[in-house]
């Protein structure tokens, strides 16, 4: 699968996770609705599904990794940034095949696309602190 298809999968995952976080609907329903309503022709759909289900089923674990390094309380974190950080930390901790630098860079790029002004700097800072904990060998 092309890297661009993976990037699109990450973008879609952030959008779907944002919806899940706000609506509190079942993740399977969010996935079905997203795939039926969005254009996913250039998306690695299998990777999208993995990110969505993986983040949803590991949300507490992922939040536990990021909470100690945040400059604010977890519940004060914006929902967009939370979705982006969850995807990136999921890749760092659960997808050893995704290179360390790729996971961090993709998180930064997602923040540039979806986040508020300068949120990419915040995301970068959090990932720089979390990454060595879950990838001590930096690979």
Swiss-Prot record:
Disulfide bridge positions per record: none
Any Pfam family the entry gives: NusB
GO molecular function terms listed in the Swiss-Prot or TrEMBL record: RNA binding
One GO location term (cellular component): cytosol
CDD domains in the cross-refs: Terminator_NusB (cd00619)
GO biological process, any: transcription antitermination
Keyword Hydrolase belongs to the record: no
UniProt keyword annotations, A-Z: RNA-binding, Transcription, Transcription antitermination, Transcription regulation
Listed InterPro entries: NusB-like_sf (IPR035926), NusB_fam (IPR011605), NusB_RsmB_TIM44 (IPR006027)
UniProt key word Translocase: no
Family per record: Belongs to the NusB family.
Function description: Involved in transcription antitermination. Required for transcription of ribosomal RNA (rRNA) genes. Binds specifically to the boxA antiterminator sequence of the ribosomal RNA (rrn) operons.
UniProt protein name: Transcription antitermination protein NusB
């Amino acid at each position: 699968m092309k890297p661009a298809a993976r990037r699109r999968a990450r973008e879609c995952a952030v959008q779907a996770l944002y919806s899940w976080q706000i609506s509190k609907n079942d993740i399977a329903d969010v996935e079905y609705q997203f795939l039926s309503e969005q254009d996913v022709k250039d998306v690695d759909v299998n990777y999208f599904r993995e990110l969505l289900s993986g983040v949803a089923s590991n949300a507490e674990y992922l939040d536990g990794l990021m909470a100690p390094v945040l400059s604010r309380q977890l519940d004060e974190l914006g929902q967009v940034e939370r979705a982006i950080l969850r995807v990136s930390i999921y890749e760092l901790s659960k997808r050893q095949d995704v290179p360390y630098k790729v996971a961090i860079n993709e998180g930064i790029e997602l923040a540039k696309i979806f986040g508020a002004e300068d949120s990419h700097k915040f995301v970068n800072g959090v990932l720089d602190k979390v990454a060595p904990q879950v990838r001590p060998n930096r690979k």
